[in-house]
């Protein structure tokens, strides 16, 4: 959520910066509401002062034995007007708050300006895509050969965009997640967490999924109780652990990691990636979250991205890093890097991780603060998140990049300790 001071003092500048994201801010509506809010607030303050004066006069008149009925009537009338003013003021503020919750974050000055993914800027590449001397099979065909990927069984259970994994491929999927968690906790300094997969609306509002992106979520309605939502990412549960907290400066940075399933309706993805595991309603992901001092968040973004890259490097999977343009960044991001892994069957790089600095955008929504030792006062923290990595898409990349001519899959060296001696999946 943006700082309300920005919207009051620099509204047109904010609108211009948001326009670079393709977001049209209704400046006239906000100005109109602000004018009404100020007018009602001024009138209410004046009325309160008059009421206080009348109340004082009642005591004086009573002491003199004068008729206080007219004064009492005035005070009662003013009390009713004050109550009506409060209702009006609350309504205006609720409308302003509703608008603010739909406004995306302001992009950092270092973010390339652009309208779509076509304007993203490649920052670097790592590794060279393998030259195959046989016809490349995609992960669906490879899974059929080994019997380890079954989309028909999943469709029977749940419909489209689900998968059943079995045997060595299921184990490889588990191995990938364990490897990622061990790397991030053992070498990158993250603390592992196990968090709920069901959260309530305030948590999703805190990280920015609600109210704007409810159609992307799976919702569980409960009669007489608060609704649940299945998490679209562990970013929601991990980041909200600091909601409403004031963190001691000595505790920062907080570095949290979790391996969870993620659930997404893919409401806007009709017809896209319908084959295989690239785009699923349910998929596993290892998520990294950092909570840092504001002055250190851009440096932390570079480190977070490097942590995600290290997974791909150790798996020896070719990838590239993109700086997302203003028009392609996520709702809450100040700046984002995407990691894209090489998928041989598609002859292109596909997103496997998104690493974002959200600045104080989420912290303001959650009221997550730290105590600045220089001032002694609570201030908003900065939050960051990144996939480290999406497990299903990493499995796709491993299957395709490590395939052999007969359809078997070599197990990457770093995963062999997790595979119980299995070196080739047939």
Curated annotation (Swiss-Prot):
Organism (species): Pseudomonas putida (strain W619)
Quaternary structure per UniProt? Homodimer. The tRNA molecule binds across the dimer.
Q: Which family does it belong to?
A: Belongs to the class-II aminoacyl-tRNA synthetase family. Type-1 seryl-tRNA synthetase subfamily.
**What is the superkingdom listed in this entry's lineage?**
Bacteria
Give the reaction(s) catalysed: tRNA(Ser) + L-serine + ATP = L-seryl-tRNA(Ser) + AMP + diphosphate + H(+); tRNA(Sec) + L-serine + ATP = L-seryl-tRNA(Sec) + AMP + diphosphate + H(+)
Give the EC number(s) under which this enzyme is classified. 6.1.1.11
Residues reported to bind L-serine:
233-235, 287, 387
Assigned keywords, A-Z: Aminoacyl-tRNA synthetase, ATP-binding, Cytoplasm, Ligase, Nucleotide-binding, Protein biosynthesis
- Its pathway? Aminoacyl-tRNA biosynthesis; selenocysteinyl-tRNA(Sec) biosynthesis; L-seryl-tRNA(Sec) from L-serine and tRNA(Sec): step 1/1
Q: What is this protein called?
A: Serine--tRNA ligase
Q: Where in the cell is it found?
A: Cytoplasm
UniProt comment concerning the protein's domains: Consists of two distinct domains, a catalytic core and a N-terminal extension that is involved in tRNA binding.
Identify the gene encoding this protein.
Answer: serS
Per its record, what are the GO molecular function terms?
Answer: ATP binding; serine-tRNA ligase activity
């Amino acid at each position: 959520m943006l700082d309300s001071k920005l919207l009051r003092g620099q509204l047109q500048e904010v609108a211009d910066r948001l326009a670079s994201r393709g977001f049209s801010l209704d400046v006239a509506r906000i100005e109109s509401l602000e004018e009404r809010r100020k007018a009602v607030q001024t009138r209410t303050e004046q009325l309160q002062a008059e009421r206080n004066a009348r109340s004082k006069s009642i005591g004086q008149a009573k002491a003199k034995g004068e008729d206080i009925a007219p004064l009492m009537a005035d005070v009662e009338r003013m009390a009713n007007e004050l109550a009506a003013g409060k209702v009006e003021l609350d309504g205006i503020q609720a409308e302003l708050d509703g608008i603010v919750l739909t406004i995306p974050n302001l992009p950092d000055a270092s973010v390339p300006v652009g309208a779509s993914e076509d304007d993203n800027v490649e920052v670097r590449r790592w590794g060279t895509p393998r030259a195959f001397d046989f016809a490349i099979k995609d992960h669906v065909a490879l899974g059929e050969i080994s019997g380890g990927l079954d989309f028909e069984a999943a469709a029977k259970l749940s419909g489209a965009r689900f998968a059943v994994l079995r045997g060595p491929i299921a184990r490889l999927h588990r191995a990938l997640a364990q490897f990622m968690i061990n790397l991030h906790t053992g070498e990158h300094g993250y603390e592992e967490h196990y968090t709920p997969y069901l959260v309530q609306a305030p948590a999703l509002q805190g990280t920015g999924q609600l109210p704007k992106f409810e159609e992307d979520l799976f919702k569980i309605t409960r009669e007489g109780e608060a609704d649940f939502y299945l998490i679209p990412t562990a970013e929601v549960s991990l980041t909200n652990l600091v909601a409403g907290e004031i963190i001691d400066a000595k505790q920062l940075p907080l570095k949290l990691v979790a391996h969870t399933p993620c659930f997404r309706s893919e409401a806007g993805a009709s017809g896209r990636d319908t084959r295989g595991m690239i785009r699923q309603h349910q998929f596993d992901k290892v998520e990294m979250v950092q909570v840092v001092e504001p002055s250190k968040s851009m440096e932390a973004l570079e480190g977070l991205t490097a942590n995600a890259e290290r997974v791909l490097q150790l798996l020896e999977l070719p990838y590239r890093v993109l700086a997302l343009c203003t028009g392609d960044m996520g709702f809450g991001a100040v700046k984002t890097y995407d990691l894209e892994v090489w998928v041989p069957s598609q002859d292109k790089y596909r997103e496997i991780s998104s690493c974002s600095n959200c600045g104080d955008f989420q912290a303001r929504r959650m009221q997550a603060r730290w105590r600045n030792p220089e001032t002694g006062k609570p201030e908003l923290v900065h939050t960051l998140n990144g996939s480290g990595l999406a497990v299903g898409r990493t499995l796709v990349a491993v299957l395709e990049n490590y395939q052999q001519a007969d359809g078997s899959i070599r197990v990457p060296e770093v995963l062999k300790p997790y595979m119980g001696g299995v070196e080739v999946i047939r």
